[in-house]
A protein has these predicted regions:
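Structural motif
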Residues: 47-53, 93-98, 147-157, 212-226, ...
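Short loop/turn segments that connect beta-strands within beta-propeller blades
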Residues: 57-59, 100-103, 160-164, 229-231, ...
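Short beta-strand elements that form the blades of beta-propeller/WD-repeat-like
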Residues: 35-43, 79-90, 96, 137-149, ...
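Blade-level signature of beta-propeller repeat domains, shared across WD40, Kelch, NHL, RCC1
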Residues: 300-331
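A short helix->beta-strand "capping" segment at the edge of beta-propeller domains
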Residues: 1-20
Length: 331
């Protein structure tokens, strides 16, 4: 199998203690010669544990604290990049939109239908932070409703116009489960959503199956990558696993879209066929690639790709180190 080889451009030592990489992004242009900037949504470890966006560039790390009002018990903040700026969706109702030096965001309200009895998002929808990528003004966002485990089984599209300072929800859907070979006919549970992407007016979703139990304890039932409609209709399956529980061995893979042609696949277990190593899947060629990390950084994980740039990080009971890498080539 071919492999994507990475070389280190810059390593970032963290002066503060952060919990986890919730989601990431890149600002345009994403190339070393023009001052690449990457985004990382995380959270401070010390109380009150505010969410923070780290802006990574050749000059170092700029920390943007989102404030205690983003600590919503029901809704996670959602990070999305938009050209040279980025937004953070707060509690389904507004966008904090950052441009320039990112010191003072514009607050743009989000419309949810035009009348109280014709809301696009139901009141019981809960926003989830899972990574989203878009090349246009429609931003796909993950949601959960009715039963809340911090997962996502629903999605919505956010129509965003920063020039007019307008935003509105356009749909709220689940992915049709019957389209997947190993769906569970015994339940009504919709497929879980790991990540969403819109590129060239096409909507893509990666699902990690339907299991309601702990996947870390019992494993996944299946996973799949699909091109879907805004209503959740599966238009094309690009990748679909076998029934993972049939062999009696725990297995599972999570998927994360990037600002490139590649989907990052991360196995749940170190004793599976992939030996716990991440792989890439090309949306264009439908081929797998291994990943060769820079020397001395084999324990790091890949979180995003844009052009020839890659964002990696080391997690060990907290976020320990971040690196910006360049793609050396495919070997």
């Amino acid at each position: 199998m071919a492999a994507l080889k990475l070389s280190l451009i810059q390593k970032y030592k963290l002066e503060n203690a952060y919990t986890y990489v919730y989601s990431t992004g890149f600002l345009s242009p994403a190339c070393p010669e023009q001052g690449a900037r990457a985004l990382l949504l995380t959270r401070r470890e010390e109380a009150p544990g505010v969410y923070t966006v780290l802006v990574l560039s050749e000059t170092g790390i700029q920390e943007i604290k989102l404030g205690e009002d983003f600590l919503d018990r029901e809704n996670d903040p959602v990070l999305f990049s938009f050209g040279k700026g980025f937004g953070v969706i707060k509690a389904k109702k507004e966008i904090a939109y950052f441009t320039g030096d990112f010191s003072s965001p514009e607050i743009i309200p989000i419309k949810n239908g035009f009348l109280p009895f014709s809301k696009t998002l139901p009141d019981n929808a809960r926003e989830r932070y899972f990574q989203t990528v878009s090349d246009g003004s429609l931003i796909p966002v993950c949601f959960e409703k009715e039963v809340y485990y911090g997962l996502s089984r629903c999605f919505a599209l956010l129509d965003f116009d920063p020039v007019k300072k307008e935003a509105k929800w356009k749909c709220f859907s689940e992915i049709e489960k019957n389209a997947f070979t190993h769906h569970d006919e015994r339940t009504k549970d919709a497929p879980k959503i790991d990540s969403l992407k819109i590129v060239n007016h096409e909507l893509y979703a990666f699902t990690s199956g339907e299991s309601t139990g702990s996947v870390n304890k019992w494993g996944m039932d299946y996973y799949a990558l699909a091109k879907i409609s805004p209503e959740g209709k599966v238009k094309e399956k690009l990748l679909e696993s076998e029934q993972l529980k049939a062999g009696g061995k725990k297995s599972g893979v999570n998927g994360t879209f990037t600002h490139s042609d590649y989907l990052i696949l991360t196995p749940l277990f170190n004793n599976d066929d992939w030996k716990g190593k991440q792989k890439l899947f090309s949306l264009r060629t439908k081929e797998y690639l291994d990943i060769v990390m820079p020397r001395g950084m084999t324990k790091h994980s890949l979180y995003n790709i844009c052009g020839e740039l890659c964002l990696i990080a080391l997690y060990d009971r907290g976020l320990k180190e971040i690196g910006l890498c360049k793609i050396e080539g495919i070997e």
